[in-house]
From Swiss-Prot:
NAD(+) binds at residues 8-39. Its EC number is 5.1.3.2, 5.1.3.5. Its cofactor is NAD(+). Optimum pH is 7.0-9.0. The gene is UGE3. Ubiquitous. Strongly inhibited by UDP. GO terms for molecular function: protein dimerization activity; UDP-arabinose 4-epimerase activity; UDP-glucose 4-epimerase activity. It comes from the Eukaryota. This is Bifunctional UDP-glucose 4-epimerase and UDP-xylose 4-epimerase 3.
């Protein structure tokens, strides 16, 4: 526990999938946590389950606020009432397809919300942030694994918001060097807390692979659409770097500790992935093994803007954050199925 004992962390989007898992780890490590979330793509039940997982004592260190970063007053209210040592900024919309159809919604949520957050942090002299970036900033990389100093490019409005927010972070740090900002580029987060009490519960039809497979397995959807079966990969399906959400959560704690301990961190990006590529069909097969369920698939044409293979180089995070993913694909599928099996309708009762 050490120096983190009463450090107070603001977690935006803390009721979401990665947010809840990270909050559990932060509380277990002795941090105080305040969540702000507008529950646009999450539910307050997830926060109740976090309290249940950490127990009554640690729960006293967790505060939840319903609020929206697009409304500066909501952020101001938090900062005027208490001092924050750092911010972990998860809040934002994250569906690639939706961003193409409704880019203004993405610019409003992801850009305006973050700019308001920076303004308020500056006003109250809280100048440390861990930011949720994404492997989408690599676009369709010419070579893999993706290394942090690759040239960045975005393929869709969602990716552009992440890329632009990275640039904003670099600009703020260049102008005001006392800021310390770590940009975490997530690859493909999957799995769930081993208890099966929290996990990913997207509203509507999921746009990423695991919740989709999961909804087929529990009978909510008839089959899995596999987009692209003619890629130049081992089985024709696209290859991605899937990472267990608990590994990702630990990566945030490692990043936070780095902010507190390294005065020279500046504004730095780290990949959070396993460094291993897994194809969509391999993932389906691994999930079938974990769940004992057959997943019917339908082979569909490629989606525009989807890359063939994207996986991380993880050396920089290993070396500088002392962090390395522990879980493999089998454990990811095991924990995903445990969550799905116990909560076939997510945090809701069956509708």
């Amino acid at each position: 526990m050490g120096s983190s004992v009463e450090q107070n962390i603001l977690v935006t989007g803390g009721a979401g999938f990665i947010g809840t898992h990270t909050v559990v780890q932060l509380l277990n490590q002795g941090f105080k946590v305040t969540i702000i979330d507008n529950l646009d793509n999450s539910v307050v039940e997830a926060v109740h389950r976090v309290r249940e997982l950490v127990g009554p004592d640690l729960s006293t260190k967790l505060e939840f606020n319903l609020g929206d970063l697009r409304n500066k007053g909501d952020i101001e209210k938090l900062f005027s009432n208490q001092r924050f040592d750092a911010v972990i900024h998860f809040a934002g919309l994250k569906a690639v397809g939706e961003s193409v159809g409704n880019p203004r919604r993405y610019f409003d949520n992801n850009l305006v919300g973050t700019i308001n957050l920076y303004e308020t942090m500056a006003k109250y002299n809280c100048k440390m942030m861990v930011f949720s970036s994404s492997a989408t900033v690599y676009g369709q990389p010419e070579i893999v694994p993706c290394v942090e100093d690759f040239e960045l490019q975005a393929m869709n409005p969602y990716g552009r918001t992440k890329l632009f927010l990275e640039e904003i972070a670099r600009d703020i740090h260049a102008a005001e060097p006392e800021w310390k900002i770590i940009l975490l580029r997530y690859f493909n987060p999957v799995g769930a807390h081993e208890s099966g009490r929290i996990g990913e519960d997207p509203k509507g039809i999921p746009n990423n692979l695991m919740p989709y497979i999961q909804q087929v397995a529990v009978g909510r959807l008839p089959e899995l659409n596999v987009f692209g079966h003619d890629y130049p990969t081992m089985d024709g399906s696209a290859v991605r770097d899937y990472i267990h959400v608990m590994d990702l959560a630990d990566g945030h704690v490692a990043a936070l500790n780095k902010l507190f301990s390294d005065s020279k961190i500046g504004c730095t990006a780290y990949n959070l992935g396993t460094g291993q590529g897994t194809s969509v069909l391999e993932m389906v097969s691994s999930f079938e093994k974990a769940s004992g369920k057959k997943i019917p698939i339908k082979l569909c044409p490629r989606r525009a803007g989807d890359a063939t293979a994207v996986y991380a180089s993880t050396q920089k995070a290993e070396k500088e954050l002392g962090w390395k993913a522990k879980y493999g694909v089998d454990e990811m599928c095991r924990d995903q199925w445990n969550w799905a099996n116990k909560n076939p309708w997510g945090f809701q009762k069956k509708p």
